[in-house]
C-alpha cells in the first residue's frame, strides 16, 4: 500500500494518543488497517490490540482487510463494535450469555406493552420508537431521571414507563445495549482489579468514526486506555450527525484538551470525488463555527459542475429525476451507482411511488414509514370505508368523536351499525339526533367526491383538521407535524380518480413495501433511496439530494445554532457521497403552499 505523507504519519505513529482528522474519501479505513499491521510488524502482540468501530459490517470489513494485508486467515487482534466489546468484558466477569441480552424484537414488544398500559391515550406516530430512543438517551448520557424532560409524553408518564421498563428488565435478568455500557463503566469503577486486567489486555486502542462516540463510551475508553494512553482515534467532526443517538461532537473537539500533547494529523486528500464536488462541499461546511479547520483537496478531474435545479412541486421533481435516472442507465451508468437522498424517511415516499410507477428498480437503506399506517391516515380511510358502505362497529367507534360528537360507545351496541338504531338510542335528545343526521349526510356526500375532494371535505366540512389542531394543543405536540400528514394524504389523493382505485393503489403500495422490507437484507439492486443518516460511509457515481428547501434541509425542528450546524453536517455528508455527479434539487411549492429554497444552496455556491 502506498500512503501519502499524512496517511504515512498516522500509520507509523507508535505510542501515546493521536487524533486523525479524516475528511471524506481520504482513506481512513486503509490508515486504521495499516497502523494495525504496522504495530504487529513492529513486534506488538496482536492480542494486545483493540480496534473498535460502530457497526458489525465495518468491523468485519476492517478485519478482512487486515487479514488480507498480513496474508493471514486468522488473528488475535480484537475487531469489534463498542457493544460487542463491552458485552465480552461483562460476559467474562459475570458469566453472562446471549440470553441475558434484550434483543431488538423483545425491546419493541416490551415498548408496545408499556405504551398500551401506561399511555394508551397518546396517539402519536412512532411513539414506541421515540420512547425507546429517549430511554437510550437517558442511559447514554447518564441523566438523572428527575432532570430529563421527555419530548414525546408528559413527565409523569415517561418516568412511570422508564421505571416499569427497568423493573421488568431487572426481574428478567436482561440488559439492553445501553446497559452494556453503563454496567461496564460501573464494573470498572467498582472493581479496579478487573479494569487493570483489561488495561493489560488492550494496550493499543484504535477507534474508527470517533465523532459518533457517546459520553459513557468515551469514559470507558479513557479508563481502558490508562496508563499508557495509546489511544488512536480516527474521525471527522464535520460528519458528526448522530446526536439523536447520543453522540456528542464536542468530545472530539475537546480531545486535545483531554490529552495535551496528543499527536494530530489531517487526512486532507479526497480520493473519491471530483474537484467541483470537493470545492462546493467545502464552501458549505466552512459556514460551521464549531469545527476543526481543514483544507480538503483532490487530485481528481474537475468533473461536471454541481447542478442546482428547481421544480414546481415534489411530484414534478421526482418525475424529472426518474427520467434522468433512466437516461443515465441507458448511457451506461448502472442503477446501483445512483442514489436519491432525503432528510427524512417520510420524504422518500414520493420517490418510491414514482420509481414504482416508472418501473425503475430501487433499494432502500431505511424501513420506509407507511403514510397510510399513521393514525390520522387510518381515521381518514375509515371515513372513506364508511362512504363505500362499511357499517362495522369498530370503524364507527374510530371516527365517532373525531371531531367530538359526544357519541357514547354504548350507542353502538350491534356489530353492524345502523343510523336508525343510533337515532332511536338518542330519540329524547334532539341535539344528538341532529349530530347523527349530520354524520350520515357527511358520509353520503363523500360517496360522490373524488379522493382529493373527499380528503378536503373531511378536513374542512367535517372539521377533522380542527380536531387535529385541538389534539396537538392538548398533547403539546407540534401542530405542523400532524397537519403535514393531512397535506401528504391530500397530495397522494390528487393522482387517484376514485376511492375504490385509491384503496387498490394503497394495497399494492403496501404489498410492494413489504416485499422491499424482506429484500432489504440481501438485495443490492437498483437506485439507492435513503435518508442522509443511513447513507454515511457509502458512495455513488451519481447523487441527488432532493427537497433542498427551508423546513426540510435544515429540518424545521432545528432552531438552535448547534442544531443548524448538525443539519449542515448532514447536508455535507450527503454531498460527499458523490464521486462524479451531484445534483441538488429544490421545489417552489409543497401542498400548494410556497416554500423557500434552502439557505444551504446559497452557501454551496459562495
Annotate each PLM feature.
Residues 151, 352, 382-606:
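Conserved helicase C-terminal RecA-like lobe
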Residues 341-400:
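Long, highly charged, low-complexity intrinsically disordered interaction regions
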Residues 15-18, 525-526:
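Pre-Walker A (Motif I) flank of P-loop NTPase domains
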Residues 24-32, 260-263, 268-361, 388-389:
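Helicase P-loop NTPase motor core
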Residues 20-22:
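Hydrophobic anchor at the beta1->P-loop junction of P-loop NTPases
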Residues 26, 211-287, 294-299, 551:
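Conserved helicase motor core of SF1/SF2 NTP-dependent helicases
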Residues 15-16, 26, 37-188, 192-200, ...:
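A basic/glycine-biased coupling hinge at the interface between accessory DNA-binding modules
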